[in-house]
Each structure stands twice: as structure tokens, then as C-alpha cells.
Amino acid sequence: MKNILSIQSHVVFGHAGNSXAEFPXRRMGVNVWPLNTVQFSNHTQYPEKWTGCVMXAEHITEIVDGIAAIGKLAQCDAVLSGYLGSAEQGRRIVDIVKKVKQANPNAWYFCDPVMGHPEKGCIVPPEVSGVLCEDALPISDIIAPNLLELETLAGGATLHNVDQCVKAARQLCQQGPKIVLVKHLSRAGFRHDRFEMLLVTADHSWHVSRPLVDFGERQPVGVGDLTSGLMLVDLLKGVELKTALEHVAAAVYEVMLKTKEMNEYELQLVAAQDQMVHPTHNFCATQLD
């Protein structure tokens, strides 16, 4: 069985960061070792309040050192990183990735470069973006930006269409990662009434589209974390790229539908777990080149 060291944020109530990736990945048949960069009461989009703290950067290193001390780091098949509470956390994660790859040269690094949202702008300090662009990108095997994050990683230019996004993703492939998953094309997609994703390698690219699920002004949080977790599991299990993209699009759609059906704000991962593994909907990915 595959093992993923997942270094992300954690919320006690709800599903974001590790709280959105840990259960789905286990339900999909892999072990997840959750290591939290922050621990909050709930995600920060609640207008009322949130409480909690950012974990000290040395805490992250100490935990991984403990795993190494019992001789288990070589069993780690992939490191997944998400929201960073500080730039120093990012630098520590880069060191952890190197340590894991030293213990297991076949291990992957899946970087979810959480910086912000196309509609909401950047939500992390510039120094965090700097660590992601300068340190995490070059050592990643797979990177999964949304549109804003793709623009930032590729140099800051605004991307207006799918062709430009493919070219920007290819630019990232030249800097380190073998695979770029653009989790949400947003305004650069073919259609604004659909949710669109890209999967890009140095030689090929695929596009998939699914219906948007209307939640009004209050969109669920954690969709990107769920997407990254599912994609990593599929790839670790040897699923072909096109098939993995199709499964992830359908699985996330099933979760969104169940969340809408139950009139909830938080992703209903437990209620949708069977459909997440075996989606009833199917969205065919188109190869662009």
C-alpha cells in the first residue's frame, strides 16, 4: 500500500487542507500521514471568526525527524504539500522533500502551491509566494496551481485563454515538474459556465470540463485540496493521466452535488464517499496536443 506524507493546513470543524485530503485519500486506498502546518477551528472564509495557530517551522522538521528515527521514512511514496503558514515552513518542507527522496529515490513531491484565488487575489505573504516559486517548484514532480497561481509561477503575466495556460504550464515543466495540473481555469477557460481543468506534460496536454454547481455567493472551501489529493492517489496507483483527470473531475463533481443536495457549506466527503470512489457521472478529457 502506498504512503503519502501530507503537509497542509488542518481545520477541526469542516474540510479544508488535510481535513479535505486525508479521508478521501484513505478511502481511495492509500495511507496518509497528516502533518499540519496550521491548526484552526474552521477555515478562514467564515465571516464570524476563526481561532487557532500556525505551527512553528521547527515542529514540522521535528515530526519528520521522528519518523526517520524509527526507520520509516523510506516507506513514504510521496510528499504532498499545501497551504503554508510561513515562508520558513516552506523552506523546511523543501528540506523534508529532499530527505524523503534520499530515503526513497522513487518518492514523488506533489506541490499544491496555495497562494490565492483568481477572484479573491493572493492570500499569502509575498515571501511565501517566493518560496513556492523559487524553492518548491524546481524540486516538484507534480504541481497543481489554479489560474492565479499558474500566472504567478510563470512570471506574473495575465493568462487569457487555454492555449496561453498550456504554454505557461509547459514553461513550468522546463523548471522541474513533469506534470502540471491546472485545477481551475476560471476566466481563461473555453466556457465560463463550466468548471475546467488542464493536465499538462512536456509533450501532451488534456482538457476536461464539468458543470458548475451553483452555491451562490458562498462557495465551499477545500475543493482544490480534495482535487490534489485525489489526483496524487490516482497517479500513485498507476492510473493513466487522461483517466486520472477524468476520474478526479467526476469525483469532485459528485462531492459538490452531494454537498448541494444536503444544503451544506462544508464539503460532504463522508456522505459522498462511495460516489467519490466510483462516480456515476463521466466527463471525457480531450487531448489538446
Swiss-Prot record:
<dbReference type="GO" id="GO:0005524">
    <property type="term" value="F:ATP binding"/>
</dbReference>
<feature type="binding site">
    <location>
        <position position="112"/>
    </location>
    <ligand>
        <name>ATP</name>
    </ligand>
</feature>
<comment type="similarity">
    <text>Belongs to the pyridoxine kinase family. PdxY subfamily.</text>
</comment>
<dbReference type="InterPro" id="IPR004625">
    <property type="entry name" value="PyrdxlKinase"/>
</dbReference>
<keyword id="KW-0418">Kinase</keyword>
<comment type="pathway">
    <text>Cofactor metabolism; pyridoxal 5'-phosphate salvage; pyridoxal 5'-phosphate from pyridoxal: step 1/1.</text>
</comment>
<comment type="subunit">
    <text>Homodimer.</text>
</comment>
<keyword id="KW-0460">Magnesium</keyword>
<keyword id="KW-0067">ATP-binding</keyword>
<feature type="binding site">
    <location>
        <begin position="44"/>
        <end position="45"/>
    </location>
    <ligand>
        <name>substrate</name>
    </ligand>
</feature>
<keyword id="KW-0547">Nucleotide-binding</keyword>
<feature type="binding site">
    <location>
        <position position="9"/>
    </location>
    <ligand>
        <name>substrate</name>
    </ligand>
</feature>
<dbReference type="GO" id="GO:0005829">
    <property type="term" value="C:cytosol"/>
</dbReference>
<keyword id="KW-0808">Transferase</keyword>
<feature type="binding site">
    <location>
        <position position="144"/>
    </location>
    <ligand>
        <name>ATP</name>
    </ligand>
</feature>
<dbReference type="InterPro" id="IPR013749">
    <property type="entry name" value="PM/HMP-P_kinase-1"/>
</dbReference>
<protein>
    <recommendedName>
        <fullName>Pyridoxal kinase PdxY</fullName>
        <ecNumber>2.7.1.35</ecNumber>
    </recommendedName>
</protein>
<dbReference type="Pfam" id="PF08543">
    <property type="entry name" value="Phos_pyr_kin"/>
</dbReference>
<dbReference type="InterPro" id="IPR029056">
    <property type="entry name" value="Ribokinase-like"/>
</dbReference>
<feature type="binding site">
    <location>
        <position position="225"/>
    </location>
    <ligand>
        <name>substrate</name>
    </ligand>
</feature>
<dbReference type="GO" id="GO:0009443">
    <property type="term" value="P:pyridoxal 5'-phosphate salvage"/>
</dbReference>
<dbReference type="InterPro" id="IPR023685">
    <property type="entry name" value="Pyridoxal_kinase_PdxY"/>
</dbReference>
<feature type="binding site">
    <location>
        <position position="183"/>
    </location>
    <ligand>
        <name>ATP</name>
    </ligand>
</feature>
<dbReference type="GO" id="GO:0008478">
    <property type="term" value="F:pyridoxal kinase activity"/>
</dbReference>
<feature type="binding site">
    <location>
        <position position="149"/>
    </location>
    <ligand>
        <name>ATP</name>
    </ligand>
</feature>
<dbReference type="GO" id="GO:0000287">
    <property type="term" value="F:magnesium ion binding"/>
</dbReference>
<feature type="binding site">
    <location>
        <begin position="210"/>
        <end position="213"/>
    </location>
    <ligand>
        <name>ATP</name>
    </ligand>
</feature>
<comment type="function">
    <text>Pyridoxal kinase involved in the salvage pathway of pyridoxal 5'-phosphate (PLP). Catalyzes the phosphorylation of pyridoxal to PLP.</text>
</comment>
